[in-house]
Amino acid sequence: MAESMQGLHRSHRCTEVSNANIGEKVTVMGWVQKRRNLGSLIFVDLRDRSGILQIVFGEENVGAEGFEKAGTLRSEFVIAVEGTVQKRTAAVNESLKTGDIEVIATSIRVLSEAQTPPFHIEENSKTSEDIRLKYRYLDLRRPDIQRNLMLRSNVLRVMRDFMANEGFLEIETPILCKSTPEGARDYLVPSRIHHGHFYALPQSPQLFKQLLMASGYDRYFQIARCFRDEDLRADRQPEFTQADMELSFVDIDDVIEVNERLLKHLFKEVINVDVEIPFKRMPWQEAMDRFGSDKPDTRFGMELCDVSEVVKDCGFGVFTGALENGGSVRGINVEGQAKMPRKKIDKLVEHAKGCGAKGLAYLCINEDGTYKSSFAKFMTEAELDALVAKMNGKPGDLLLFAADKNKIVWNVLGALRLMLGAELGLIDENKYNFLWVTEFPLLEWSDEENRFMAMHHPFTMPMEEDWDKIDSDPGAVRAKAYDIVLNGTELGGGSVRIHQDDIQEKMFEVLGFTKERAHEQFGFLLDAFSYGVPPHAGLAFGVDRICMHMLHTDNIKEVIAFPKVKDASDLMSEAPGTVDPKQLEELGIAVAAEEDEE
């Protein structure tokens, strides 16, 4: 039977009790981690979010009733204990912060009993993730998850303090917004009052923070909840948190400078890591050419090498065919791996195909300087020597090549580079390599839409020196956009925004927007800008991803209290779920029957 805690007041969390309290009376409360009955004494490990404290029950101190009660305790019972702190008389437990003290109980109350949990509440649980997420309220009791969430709380606190000291105003923007279908898929919310009309949950506060700049709030900041109905992966959730900011009367360098200082301060305050600033900057084109990625992991080499010029006249049709079709031939040097088993090379080929390649060419440089290759018979010895020299190959190296359109070649070799870097132990997991990727293309061509699309969003300012190409070569126009990358992860990004009417109108025209469509989707923003808007720029980065890097986990679910699984469902609450037909009727919604798959 559960007891009341009336009249009791917790004096300390478990690990707040220390040698300084020896001889003092304390009141502690928490969960029973473990009970050991030694006959005349009962030992209980009491757990709260701070850690574990040993409680000792002896009949002479706690009384017959209290001792009997202690004997009934099981894992996860919630108890309150009054007692006196003393130095441990038995062996000290070096693994516990409180390992050299204990509390001699003088009274106990069982505040809540517990049934046997489906898994043991312990560090590094081997329980399947599905079971852990189904009973997330139990999983959240585990010390490692609690440390993760406490670190996350600290990250948010430090961010807020820093931004306030920098003169930013924390302003909340709406959650119920208008759908603007230029980005990822929206989560839609039907309106009960306006039948047939829908709100959208925000993918970001983009439009509202620009409106705040037009309204004179020259430094805005928000810890923003954002929603995207897109396929999930290890570092992506349908709802996520970003640190969002916008500044007026600034250019790229101003935004980059304040964010570098923020990240330096954050890593020092939260995990005591010194981050050097300024961060390196790399144009998008260079990142793609060197690393095959716009979010390169610069902790190791194995950079891509363009060998198109070397092989343009060779007899290997795969290479020359790719070049004739406007593509390129590039390679990576996997140093010291010439003796990689053929089965492993075949796996690399399959991985390359999974990334869009038709195949993968390879060349092994034997220790005697001879070559073993999938294409050597199509090239002369001089051509092979020139190719190896271009790749800085030496005896013992394995050279891998992809030939196709640039986009495919970058994707294939970039993915192989990351896979091999991890498998061969080339990545220093203790390094924090920050990088700004800049000068992104303003536009990218969509075969599906048969038009140019904004690589970021329609309000991104083009680089002034490229603007004269907007009609003749739109794909060559670079944007005043920048992404912040950490160890191969895009933490976030931003841009300088368009604040000039003529540039914005031209941007909409290039994107295929009529004036009517532009006004229908973004009229409130365009109207606001007609009343005077300052030059402005901003950035947002993912809080979840920063926490992942600080904790060295590649699973975003480990840093979110109540995450979704891969199909965007919540195993604990069973969301999404069906709703009462009356609710649907009020909203004017009829659910279409699913068609049977043939």
From Swiss-Prot:
<feature type="binding site">
    <location>
        <position position="228"/>
    </location>
    <ligand>
        <name>L-aspartate</name>
    </ligand>
</feature>
<dbReference type="GO" id="GO:0003676">
    <property type="term" value="F:nucleic acid binding"/>
</dbReference>
<comment type="subunit">
    <text>Homodimer.</text>
</comment>
<dbReference type="InterPro" id="IPR006195">
    <property type="entry name" value="aa-tRNA-synth_II"/>
</dbReference>
<comment type="similarity">
    <text>Belongs to the class-II aminoacyl-tRNA synthetase family. Type 1 subfamily.</text>
</comment>
<feature type="binding site">
    <location>
        <position position="456"/>
    </location>
    <ligand>
        <name>L-aspartate</name>
    </ligand>
</feature>
<dbReference type="Pfam" id="PF02938">
    <property type="entry name" value="GAD"/>
</dbReference>
<dbReference type="InterPro" id="IPR012340">
    <property type="entry name" value="NA-bd_OB-fold"/>
</dbReference>
<dbReference type="GO" id="GO:0140096">
    <property type="term" value="F:catalytic activity, acting on a protein"/>
</dbReference>
<dbReference type="InterPro" id="IPR004524">
    <property type="entry name" value="Asp-tRNA-ligase_1"/>
</dbReference>
<keyword id="KW-0067">ATP-binding</keyword>
<dbReference type="GO" id="GO:0006422">
    <property type="term" value="P:aspartyl-tRNA aminoacylation"/>
</dbReference>
<feature type="binding site">
    <location>
        <begin position="228"/>
        <end position="230"/>
    </location>
    <ligand>
        <name>ATP</name>
    </ligand>
</feature>
<dbReference type="GO" id="GO:0004815">
    <property type="term" value="F:aspartate-tRNA ligase activity"/>
</dbReference>
<keyword id="KW-0648">Protein biosynthesis</keyword>
<feature type="binding site">
    <location>
        <begin position="542"/>
        <end position="545"/>
    </location>
    <ligand>
        <name>ATP</name>
    </ligand>
</feature>
<dbReference type="InterPro" id="IPR004115">
    <property type="entry name" value="GAD-like_sf"/>
</dbReference>
<keyword id="KW-0436">Ligase</keyword>
<keyword id="KW-0030">Aminoacyl-tRNA synthetase</keyword>
<keyword id="KW-0547">Nucleotide-binding</keyword>
<comment type="function">
    <text>Catalyzes the attachment of L-aspartate to tRNA(Asp) in a two-step reaction: L-aspartate is first activated by ATP to form Asp-AMP and then transferred to the acceptor end of tRNA(Asp).</text>
</comment>
<dbReference type="InterPro" id="IPR029351">
    <property type="entry name" value="GAD_dom"/>
</dbReference>
<dbReference type="Pfam" id="PF00152">
    <property type="entry name" value="tRNA-synt_2"/>
</dbReference>
<dbReference type="InterPro" id="IPR047089">
    <property type="entry name" value="Asp-tRNA-ligase_1_N"/>
</dbReference>
<dbReference type="InterPro" id="IPR004365">
    <property type="entry name" value="NA-bd_OB_tRNA"/>
</dbReference>
<dbReference type="GO" id="GO:0016740">
    <property type="term" value="F:transferase activity"/>
</dbReference>
<dbReference type="GO" id="GO:0005737">
    <property type="term" value="C:cytoplasm"/>
</dbReference>
<dbReference type="InterPro" id="IPR047090">
    <property type="entry name" value="AspRS_core"/>
</dbReference>
<feature type="binding site">
    <location>
        <position position="182"/>
    </location>
    <ligand>
        <name>L-aspartate</name>
    </ligand>
</feature>
<dbReference type="GO" id="GO:0005524">
    <property type="term" value="F:ATP binding"/>
</dbReference>
<feature type="binding site">
    <location>
        <position position="497"/>
    </location>
    <ligand>
        <name>L-aspartate</name>
    </ligand>
</feature>
<dbReference type="InterPro" id="IPR045864">
    <property type="entry name" value="aa-tRNA-synth_II/BPL/LPL"/>
</dbReference>
<dbReference type="InterPro" id="IPR002312">
    <property type="entry name" value="Asp/Asn-tRNA-synth_IIb"/>
</dbReference>
<feature type="binding site">
    <location>
        <position position="237"/>
    </location>
    <ligand>
        <name>ATP</name>
    </ligand>
</feature>
<dbReference type="Pfam" id="PF01336">
    <property type="entry name" value="tRNA_anti-codon"/>
</dbReference>
<dbReference type="InterPro" id="IPR004364">
    <property type="entry name" value="Aa-tRNA-synt_II"/>
</dbReference>
<feature type="binding site">
    <location>
        <position position="490"/>
    </location>
    <ligand>
        <name>ATP</name>
    </ligand>
</feature>
<keyword id="KW-0963">Cytoplasm</keyword>
<protein>
    <recommendedName>
        <fullName>Aspartate--tRNA ligase</fullName>
        <ecNumber>6.1.1.12</ecNumber>
    </recommendedName>
</protein>
<feature type="region of interest" description="Aspartate">
    <location>
        <begin position="206"/>
        <end position="209"/>
    </location>
</feature>
